[in-house]
Amino acid sequence: MTDFWNERYAQEEYAYGLQPNVFFKDAIGEIPKGKLLFPAEGEGRNAVFAAQLGYEVYAFDTSKEAKIKADKLAEEYGVTLDYNVGNLEALNYPENYFDAVILIYAHVPAEVRTEFCQHLLRLLKPNGQIIFEGFSQEQLKYTSGGPKNSEMLFSESQVKNDFPNVAFNSLSTEVISLDEGKYHQGLGSVVRFRAKKLS
């Protein structure tokens, strides 16, 4: 998969545009200033937006081309990102460190998904927040992007299983109109939630 993403992000244009994800943009204002982690952040559109607002931004992706694009975008906007290339388990982030985790279209293989999500929970401080949007299992009916493997898509019940010990402020499956660069265009089905770590 890393080769796939390196090839996509090596293109000159930004694959998913320059503007932050709408759900994330609407929700971030309720997170106090602090340390935010952006897993699978790609070309940096959401991380750069958060840095512009004054958050301390950490991000990672397995694609080196993604980091090149994210660093370029950060430089253009005059902000700094702590952006690493690698897998979550290799990056050694400290536990109970981040004030929020922002998961926007972070689709990982089914065999590692639960541990990936629970590892992220361990990195969150108590009362730390999660903002999440990803394609639902209904997305296979649509052509607006996302994995074609249903096991990499989300459902509400799956999310509840993958994120124990959180209080959901909101959790829904919605059909939305996507306009995020070349690869997220048209109607799509997404799972969205906002939650807080209990302890």
Model-derived features: where do they sit?
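Conserved class I S-adenosyl-L-methionine
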Residues: 1-31
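Conserved SAM/SAH-binding beta-strand->alpha-helix loop
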Residues: 63-65
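Conserved SAM-binding strand-loop segment of SAM-dependent methyltransferases
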Residues: 77-89
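A short acidic, Gly/Pro-enriched loop at the edge of an enzyme's catalytic core
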Residues: 89-100
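A short SAM/SAH-binding and catalytic strip from SAM-dependent methyltransferases
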Residues: 99-114
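A short glycine-rich, Lys/Arg-flanked "PGG" loop and its adjoining helix->strand segment in the class I
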Residues: 114-126
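Conserved beta-strand signature within the Rossmann-like core of class I S-adenosyl-L-methionine
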Residues: 127-135
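Short alpha-helix
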Residues: 151-173
